[in-house]
Every structure is written in structure tokens, then in C-alpha cells.
UniProtKB/Swiss-Prot annotation:
Catalysed reaction equations from the record: L-aspartate + H(+) = beta-alanine + CO2
Cofactor: pyruvate
Identification of the protein by name: Aspartate 1-decarboxylase
Species of provenance: Neisseria gonorrhoeae (strain ATCC 700825 / FA 1090)
Annotated metabolic or biological route of this protein: Cofactor biosynthesis; (R)-pantothenate biosynthesis; beta-alanine from L-aspartate: step 1/1
EC numbers for this chain: 4.1.1.11
The encoding gene: panD
């Protein structure tokens, strides 16, 4: 049996742009994608901490070091520039694989620069 488990996430990133006229997706700084183990074109779930919206799309690699977090197409209606979002990818693992798996949690600063990468989420802690 396989279970769907958190693979990686970018925690509390700041939306830098919202482009309604683009075809779709979320553009994310390639450095952040790499750090979280998220691939270009991978399906991701997004939570907007400002308004509670939860939605899915796929990733497009943005310029390295740019800090870009741009929601494109219809998803641009669900965010505003400056909103705080969490970007999560999920993977399918077998029962034996789950015990050894450690998701990559990328913590960023207000400019979407990596400030830490952890493999766990402390309970009841604000990161």
C-alpha cells in the first residue's frame, strides 16, 4: 500500500507577483524549488495564510536567486502581492519507505531567501 506524504515545502514565502494573463501555474525561484526537492512542472498545493485559500497548480522554475513567487492565470485571483503562502509537494511512499523519509521544509525570510532547511516540523511551534 502507498500513502501520500509531504515531500517538501516552502514555508511562509511572500508573493512577489500575480499575473492573471499568464497561462497558469506558480513561478518559483529555482533555488527554492531545489532546496525543497520540488521539480519544475510538479503538482503543488498552496495555502494562502492571509485569506485561507487552498488550491493546487504546478510549478515553473523562476530565475535563481530572484526570490520570485508569482501566481499565474486563474490562481492569481486567489492571492495579492505581499501575501504569505505555503507551497507543498506530496509524494507516494510505501509503508517501509515512510519510516526513513524526511520531508524538506524550507524556511524563508521576507525576501524569499533561504534562512534554514529542516527535515521536521516541531509541534506547536511558530517557524
Amino acid at each position: 500500500m502507498f500513502r501520500t506524504i509531504l515531500g517538501g515545502k516552502i514555508h511562509r514565502a511572500t508573493v512577489t507577483e500575480a499575473d492573471l494573463n499568464y497561462v497558469g501555474s506558480i513561478t518559483v525561484d529555482q533555488d527554492l524549488l531545489d532546496a525543497a526537492g520540488i521539480c519544475p512542472n510538479e503538482k503543488v498545493a498552496i495555502v494562502n495564510n492571509n485569506n485561507g485559500e487552498r488550491f493546487e497548480t504546478y510549478t515553473i522554475a523562476g530565475k535563481r536567486g530572484s526570490g520570485v513567487i508569482c501566481l499565474n492565470g486563474a490562481a492569481a485571483r486567489l492571492v495579492q502581492k505581499g501575501d504569505i503562502v505555503i507551497i507543498m509537494s506530496y509524494i507516494q511512499l510505501s509503508e517501509p519507505e515512510i519510516a526513513a523519509h524526511e520531508p524538506k521544509v524550507v524556511l524563508v525570510d521576507g525576501n524569499n531567501k533561504i534562512r534554514d532547511i529542516i527535515s521536521y516540523e516541531p509541534p506547536h511551534t511558530v517557524l
